[in-house]
Amino acid sequence: MNISRLPLLVCAVLVYWLVAAVAPPVTPTASPAAPQSDMAETDTAKNKSASQSAPKTSKKPKRAAGLLYGIAKAPAKAAGTIRLGAYNIENLFDGVDDPSLSGEYDDIKMQTSEDRCKSLAKAIHDLDADVLCLEEVEGEDALRWFRDTYLKDMGYEFLASKEVGYYRGVEQSLLSRFPIKDVQIWTTEDLAPMEKYIPKDTDQRKKEGWGDDPKVKEPLKFQRSPLKATIDLPSGQELTIYVVHHKAGGKATAHHRELESLRMNEMVKADLAKNPDAFVAVVGDLNATPMEKAAKLYRDKDFAGLVSAYEFRPEAGQAKEKKSAAPDATDSSAQADGSADANADESDAKSDATSKADAKSKAAEKLAAKNLYLTHITNRSIDYILLSPALVKIAVPKSFFVFGTLMPGSDYDYKKDQPPAGYASDHCPIAIDLKSAATNSAKPKTDAATPPAAKEVAK
């Protein structure tokens, strides 16, 4: 370094320090990029706010709203038959306050919208059941109001619904074109004695398909008591119906459902012991798929020995189509000289594409066939009509069906979102036809709609 230049360097540093000390401070910009416009900043804030509070709508739902299950048009009833139907109508509430319900389960908040009422009514009209078993109805007043307002031309002169003390304020009900009598419920039934049917050994329980044994044993009763009633059929015979709605939930509540099912099986078995030729049906929402224990028990010959109406679907009993061996498109014997033929390569490619398309088509057909008999928005079959041996004899072959109603898209959140227009329930109705010596084909009209009476605290 040239020492002679050192004084100049020191002076330069001193001058720079003095200028920096006197000059006003410079506020740094938020970003090295050009400043954003007011509109851009507003859009950013809106996007941030939307991402924090609004539901995600940017992605297209994997499944759009539509008819996902069942058939689009209910078949007409054959002459001389009676149609037995079931429908969980997902919390049918009228507009009259029930003082016993408040807070989260205030019935006024739960009032069923006009659109849903009309959609439910349309499904019930199309189903055209002579005897219709319903689940999740607020009560007799609400059912009567709904019938008189939306089903005046259906001929449902008779109805039944009884308060079961369920905390959400819903119960099982009946609408019928034929007289109803001997209505019963079991609101205090102790299910503990049903434990005698369940193995104590954990491994044995699993082997037999029972639910896990609860660590804490609480006194259990029917979550929603079944409703039992007798229908006087036009033929002069009687039809005994149990309208059921088992405890909801997954594996954690399987044990409760099984106890409910066991007690129901005892009741049905007792009925059939008195009269093996009795017309007895268990109808409703079991909250269990066909291979779960709570549902299988009904079909067990050691218990009630009932037959599921699913056995009377059009496809039931048909021989399975044998798999035919597809020709191998790459077989070298197709070429006499074994040469690489361009036309053969093109043919192979087309054959491969056709095979893939056929496989995809068959998979779609298989899925569509399965969807014909799913009944719940969760892609499950959990709604049933279970028949006694005498009813099996008069069940019309291939007459069982699931009637398709509009289901929301896969992005629907029932806790937050309003259901789409035309939505009726998270369940689809089901039905089967029964032969009868004489049927009441006429549909007498009910009286004009009357406003539901004010509810009392104790129903």
Regions found by a protein language model. Name each.
Residues 174-234:
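A well-ordered secondary-structure block
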Residues 89-92, 137, 246, 284-286, ...:
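Active-site metal-binding loops of divalent metal-dependent hydrolases
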Residues 2-7, 28-149, 153, 160-171, ...:
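N-terminal, active-site-proximal structural segment of metallo-dependent hydrolase catalytic domains
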Residues 9-20:
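Bacterial N-terminal signal peptides
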Residues 36-48, 54-74, 268-281, 288-459:
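Metal-dependent phosphoester-hydrolase catalytic domains
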Residues 139-141, 167-169, 249-250, 287-293, ...:
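Active-site environment of divalent metal-dependent phosphoester hydrolases
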Residues 76-84, 93, 214-217, 221-246:
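Beta-strand-turn-beta hairpins that frame and shape the catalytic cleft
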Residues 254-276:
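A long, amphipathic alpha-helix that forms part
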